Amino acid sequence: MKVHVRKSDTVVVISGKDKGKTGEVLKVYPKTGKVLVQGINIVKKHQKANKSQVESAIIEREAAINSSKVMLYCNKCKNATRIANKILDDGTKVRVCKKCSETF
């Protein structure tokens, strides 16, 4: 499954419990079409005690969300935006904001 965002992109959540929040993409899972975004979709994980860790604990961490729930954030527009692919004169392919033509 093709994912429209890359690692270290700034994205905005457009639906779900974290709607409107922005964060940086930490990891992309192209096979499942999910992304891990910093500070978004926080879940509680119950950690069992083991030899290296003496006590059990409840840890809060990010969980992956579907890539269709995020849009790329344009720093120039200060808004979520769709992206277009543009080929420059030297043949390199870049991602461009559809609203203001800012390159990513």
UniProtKB/Swiss-Prot annotation:
GO terms for biological process: translation. CDD domains: KOW_RPL26 (cd06089). Pfam families: KOW, ribosomal_L24. It comes from the Bacteria. GO terms for cellular component: ribonucleoprotein complex; ribosome. Disulfide bonds: none annotated. GO terms for molecular function: rRNA binding; structural constituent of ribosome. Keywords: Ribonucleoprotein, Ribosomal protein, RNA-binding, rRNA-binding. The keyword Ribonucleoprotein applies. Coiled coil: none annotated. HAMAP family: Ribosomal_uL24_B (MF_01326_B). Belongs to the universal ribosomal protein uL24 family. One of two assembly initiator proteins, it binds directly to the 5'-end of the 23S rRNA, where it nucleates assembly of the 50S subunit. Part of the 50S ribosomal subunit. This is Large ribosomal subunit protein uL24. The gene is rplX.
